[in-house]
Amino acid sequence: MNQYILMLHSDPAVFRTENMSPQRIQEIFGKYKAWRDRMAGEGKLAGGNKLENETGRLMRAENGSGKIHITDGPYAESKEIIAGFFVLKAESYEQAVKLASDCPHLEFGTIEVRRIEA
């Protein structure tokens, strides 16, 4: 069976938990937990986690010089960040997309589905 990574993209300027009530935050996290638990119960979940929004390092090699440039923050040239990921077991892209289609992250951002090469 193949593995597929679901990269959960979101705009941190749009989805800000500090602007939400504690009840709303718990409701959102509950939706993610229920979805994750269902995938695990069906034997489809291979892993996953939320990533910190405000931390990280972007590393870029300078062509031919051997120098590496390191920038603070997870951001490339995009407003969106990868907020988290899941790894699912599926027979095909079609099945992976079907499994991801009711992931609660679609309420807040986009999901990029990619097959992991074996």
Predicted regions and their residues:
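Conserved, structured core segments of small domains
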Residues: 1-118
